[in-house]
Amino acid sequence: MRWALLGLLVWIFGAMAALANGEKSGEFDYYVLSLSWSPNWCAREGDARGSDQCDARHDHGWILHGLWPQYHQGWPSYCPTAKAPPSRAMTRQMEDIQGSSGLAWHQWKKHGTCSGLSAADYYALSRQAYDRIARPPVFRKLDKAVKLPARVVEDAFLDANPGLEPDMITVTCKHGYIEEVRVCLSRDLDPVPCGRDVIRDCTASDSLFDPIR
């Protein structure tokens, strides 16, 4: 009994020390909303992993990679927090927009802990941010893989979201594929200019873009 009590005290003081060090949860300047085109991720690595996200029955297009707290320069991650981690039920409820409960868990652990929110509130805000940005329907109409410049993707999002300006969005590519669209949002989820470290515009003129499965 004495050793159990001692172990509990060690854990409590260790947790208190962790909260006293590192990046402070809830202290950041704005959010980055990251959207990933699921068919491209599946072609690059998801199929090789046997990810259920890539099964055609899900009909995934733009999924929510994450909602990331951001500084004007740099970003926090894995922040010490007293907030309880999400339950399995919570992460499963995010599968419809995040593709997998595993991604939802990872995003909470790396980014949600820095939001200052509870897991439930972080997921609710993430869903709200996802719904706030219109995803151009034109990409769901593709019936075969195409090659296109990232600028085409960016322009489609700008046209679909009148409140967005070019300095509020960036499109990334990876291994020859369009990878992600990232939109910078205020704490109230209004579009704001991105910091220079967020802007990573893909300069390739012919990145692959796969159709919905």
Q: Which residues does each PLM region occupy?
A:
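Positively charged n-region of N-terminal signal peptides that target proteins for export
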Residues: 1-4
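N-terminal module-boundary/linker segments of secreted carbohydrate-active enzymes
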Residues: 20-44
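Domain-level detector of nuclease and nuclease-like folds
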Residues: 32-34, 46-213
